[in-house]
Each structure stands twice: as structure tokens, then as C-alpha cells.
């Protein structure tokens, strides 16, 4: 039945039968189709006729309102997720093991390159409604399909080992990265080797690097774990041969190797010679070599191991030949991730001599107070050997000193070492081939030209050839396997002369003199050149700087420091020269400036806590710094 007052659909009334009076107009007769050219011509938009009862809008060219719903995508995916849960419009069923997972192809393909390739290429799966997957965990797949709809997933210890390979297969890189981030947070000595192997298996390069770095940095603890004991030979060899191993002493590497061998001694004893070649036996003390290594039956019964032991003992017995005897086994290890830390030791200011010390970390641009020495020392010589800092001689306000102490950055403590044979202040100190050299200085009565050498492995001082000139306020640096004693004061004049010590022949020879006379200057080596900065020429404090090239055999001037300095110290670090503290002719300084050889310019660096003249400075490569509970100071660089 038709509704009242309406015409039947599809029918029209002829004009002659239409009712008189007002009423709707009859529709216009159909028009013939326009010619092809006219149809192709773009039509001009006409203003829409106002509807009955509708508001009239102004026609403004280019005026419109853009709408952007920030929740549209979220709401759409929430709706699709609900549809999936109810099985609405699902066009694919994933079969894995005994599990069936319903989904929408378009959602999976839009999130996963793996599914995109499966459903859009000419693969048989693109036309199927049921697909079976292999080599993927059912629960992990279910979680990842749910993630495709919700963009949410929880990674934890219960699912990470199945979720990461599944995310890798489906190329869901965000989930894969989340798994790697979780594993990174779980690194511990007990599991880092396992995580490293897992990362390697699944080609997680960043996680692999981080886990490997963790193994190197925590090797002492890692070597005590079950995971280490179960490592194959190849991986043990790679670890113990690494230059980047973080060990307080080579004894830790030796003990780790023996523990691994003894875990399955019958199978592994054959590998002892190969393993011992990776242990840096020359860096062990002579007492340890004779008391432990030579006494170990696993080592003693292998001829190759006996040769390695003889090599190590020869390194100890002929210290002056260490430059010639050097091999990969005599090179100290440098911990992965370690950074340079500059130590300022002792020194003095007006009416005070300091025993306190501070250290500057370039990574944070901060100074930290570290443990004080047991003795106050100004005019002290400081150098680093291995992973320890040595403060040699100096002046305590009453007498010139022969005592020596060393700083352990791991424990943040100073320990006494064997004293020198001679009291020395204003001396030059440098390290070469694991030995500590002390030259010249003042013994309380006269300037000295004598020199001596300290071997930390044996704890003995040995006299070496004397310099040709008595030198007080001298500085010493090492370059190309030789020592250079630069300038100083001989009790009558300030010196421009320089002499070189060659350990192999135990002799000093003169080299080209500096352009200026200098005592109390700063001396350091950077990029194969010997630099001397500031000092005193007998009339004034200097800011001039010069550089010596062994190839040219001559000195040349470079940019002067911004401040006149003497009794300061100079050290190379991170490709820069740092001039630390000193005296400007009227007062002690806590300021520091650094030199860039690439731009030939000096710029200000962060100041120390304390003003220090006659200070000793050296650099250690450290992983964990600062020590616990050490005060810090961040001082902005100031205009010099």
C-alpha cells in the first residue's frame, strides 16, 4: 500500500491531468547528452540555492575549516580490536601449534612488513583465509597480533626470550627494541654472557655490543660465574686476549684461565699453552711468577708455557731493555669505556702546603675531591704507571722528601711505596715502559744531576746515569722511548738546555736548546711533539710556549698561554694540552687553560677548587669515577 498523498514510485503525472493551483513543479524533461567536448570542459561551480528554512551563508573565497581528530586512529583501532575479539569481518586465521588466532589482513599488513609481503605479493597465502606459521611461539604471536591492534605490549622476564625472536621474524622493530632495552636493564655478571649470546643469535647488534662491553668491564666477577665456566675455548681466548679487559691486576686474568681449565681439567688441560699466551705474564710481579705460575703443574709441564715464563722473568731482570722486549703481552690493558681523568696533587698557596688532591673528569666537566695524601707535598713529581698514580718526593714545609706514595682509584686510597735513594724536591718525574723515573731536583743542600728508576713490580729503586747538568725546577717527559729533561735552574742561572736519556744505553746526551731559558716550566708530549709552556727566565714569569720536533731537531714557537705561569704542570689529555695551576708572578692560581694544536689556540677550562703552585699533575684512564661520596664542583670556564 502506498502512503497517502504520495505518487507511486517511478510514475509521473501528465500536464493535462494536473490539478490547478499551486503545487510542486513537474520535473524538467530529460536533456539530451552533451557533446563530448562540452562534457570534458570543467563546469563552473554555482552557489547552492538556499534551502527552505535554511540559514544563508556568506560566500568567501578560500574560507574553510579543517578538522583533525586526534583520537580517530586510536578509536578506529580500538573498534577493530573489539571486532577481532567478536570475530567480525576477520579474513585470516593464523595457525601456530594448536592455537588459532583470528585477525584482519589489512591490520597485520599495515603493521608488519612480514605480513605485508605475505598478503600483498603473489604468494599463495594472499588468497587463503587460513595460514600456518612455523618457528614462532604461539603465545608470543598472540601478543604481537594484539599489539598490532592496541600498540601496547608488556615485556618481562617471562616472555622476552620468546617475544624477541617472534618480533624479529615479523619485523616489528619497535617491539624488538623494547625487548633489547629490557635485556639491557637486566645485565648482571651472572647473566651477561648468556644475554650476549642471545643477542648474537638474533642479530641485535646494539645489545650485543652493550653486553660485550659489560662482560669486559665486570670481568673479575663474570669469571666466577657458571656461564663463564661453560664458555667454549674460542670465546675464552677472545676475552682474555682483549686489550679492553677491566682488571685491577693481571693476576685476575691468570686465575680466571686456570679456573676455566680446572672446571673440566681432563678435556681442557690441552688448551693451557694457548690460554697462557693471552695472559700478560710480564705484567705479573716476580714473586707471583715464581710462587704461583712456576709452581702450577698445569703450566710447568708444558714447554711452551716454560718459554712464556722465561720471557716474563727476562722482562723483570732487564728493565732497561723493556722497550726492545716489548710485545702484546707487555702492553697494559685499557678498560673498555674508560675515560681520562686529570689529577692535581698537592702543591702550595700562600703560607700553605697541600696534601689534598682533586680530579677533573672531562666527560662531566666537573672537579671532584679525592683522598688526601698521607704527607703534604709541594714541588712534587707526579706520574701514572698502569692504573696507579705516584707522588714522588717534594717538600712538606720543613724538609725535602725521599718518600713516595701511590693512589689506587678503585679504593680511593693512598699507600706508601719504597722511598727513593735521595731526597728530592723540584724534581722531574716521568713514566716509561712501566717504570718510574726521577731526575734532578734539590736535596735541601744542593741542586742534583743524579737520577733513579723505580720498578713497581719489584718495589725497587735503581740508580741510573746522572745528567750532564745539575737541574732544579726541572721537568721530564717521555718521547719515542726516551726521556727528555727540559730546562731548570743550576743554582746560578736558569737553563735553556735540554738532554735526552736513552734507557737501552743508560746515557744522557744533549739535544737542541730551547728558544728561551726556563725553570719551573710545564712540559708534556702531544701528537709526537715535545711542548714546554711558561716557566721563569730569571727576570719574569713567562706565558710563551715552544715545541720540539725530533725529526727537525729544533724548537719553534707556538701560541702563548693567556696567563703567565710558572711552577704549574702541563699534561696531554684527549688531544689537548692542559696547563694547570701555578703562579703568575704574584699569586698562586687555580685556573686552567688548554691548548688545541689544530687551531693553535689556548682557551679557558674549568677551575680547580684550590689554588695550587708547585703542583703535580697526571692522567689516569678510569671506568668508574668519581669515587663514592666524593664532593663535586662544576665551575664554568672563566675569561683568562
Curated annotation (Swiss-Prot):
Residue intervals of the BTB domain: 90-157
Metabolic or biological pathway, per its Swiss-Prot or TrEMBL entry: Protein modification; protein ubiquitination
Organism, as annotated: Rattus norvegicus (Rat)
Any single Gene Ontology cellular-component annotation: cytoplasm
Main localization of the protein described in the UniProt heading: other
GO BP, one annotated term: regulation protein catabolic process at postsynapse
InterPro entries linked: BACK, BTB-kelch_protein, BTB/POZ_dom, Gal_Oxase/kelch_b-propeller, Kelch-typ_b-propeller, Kelch_1, SKP1/BTB/POZ_sf
Gene3D superfamilies in UniProt: 1.25.40.420, Kelch-type beta propeller, Potassium Channel Kv1.1, Chain A
Gene name linked to the record: Klhl17
Alphabetized UniProt keyword annotations: Actin-binding, Kelch repeat, Repeat, Synapse, Ubl conjugation pathway
Functional summary from the UniProt entry: Substrate-recognition component of some cullin-RING-based BCR (BTB-CUL3-RBX1) E3 ubiquitin-protein ligase complexes. The BCR(KLHL17) complex mediates the ubiquitination and subsequent degradation of GLUR6. May play a role in the actin-based neuronal function.
Lineage, highest ranks first: Eukaryota, Metazoa, Chordata, Craniata, Vertebrata
Location relative to the cell: Postsynaptic density; Synapse
Protein name: Kelch-like protein 17
Segments for region (Disordered): 1-50
Region (Interaction with F-actin), start-end ranges: 287-639
Repressor recorded as keyword: no
Record text on subunit structure and interactions: Interacts with F-actin; the interaction disrupts the F-actin structures and leads to marked changes of neuronal morphology. Component of a complex, composed of PDZK1, SYNGAP1, KLHL17 and NMDA receptors. Interacts directly with PDZK1 (via PDZ1 domain); the interaction is important for integrity of actin cytoskeleton structures in neurons. Interacts with DLG4 and SYNGAP1. Interacts (via kelch repeats) with GRIK2 (via C-terminus); the interaction targets GRIK2 for degradation via ubiquitin-proteasome pathway. Interacts with GRIK1.
PANTHER family on file: KELCH PROTEIN (PTHR24412), KELCH-LIKE PROTEIN 17 (PTHR24412:SF475)
Pfam families: BACK, BTB, Kelch_1
Tissue/organ expression: Brain specific. Broadly expressed in neurons of most regions of the brain.
